Amino acid sequence: MNSTGFNDTDSALFSNTSFLSCCNVSSVVTDSGFVSAALDERSVFIMRTVQIAVMCVLALTVVFGIFFLGCNLLIKSEGMINFLVTDRRPSKDVEAVIVGSY
């Protein structure tokens, strides 16, 4: 077994860690770090507000759709009932009784 192969891979591993240690993520963050957090909170708040507004509009659309659909079905059912009911005219005897009771 050749020990130089192991030494080469070990040195390659350590060279990568030394490369990563020089370039840490803290250089990407802005000066105070709070500015990016405030902007992130603001964008999250705006996104949540927009989501709530969209859900309210969709809920109102569904509620009014069900309401108007129900009203339309009620009107149609009343029309069908009136169509099925035969037209009954009161007889003259009923009028005489009503007039006579006063």
Swiss-Prot record:
It is a single-pass membrane protein. Its main location: cytoplasm. It is found in: Cytoplasm; Membrane. Keywords: Cytoplasm, Membrane, Transmembrane, Transmembrane helix. GO terms for cellular component: cytoplasm; membrane. Disulfide bonds: none annotated. The chain crosses the membrane at residues 50-70. Belongs to the reprimo family. May be involved in the regulation of p53-dependent G2 arrest of the cell cycle. This is Protein reprimo B. It comes from Danio rerio. The gene is rprmb.
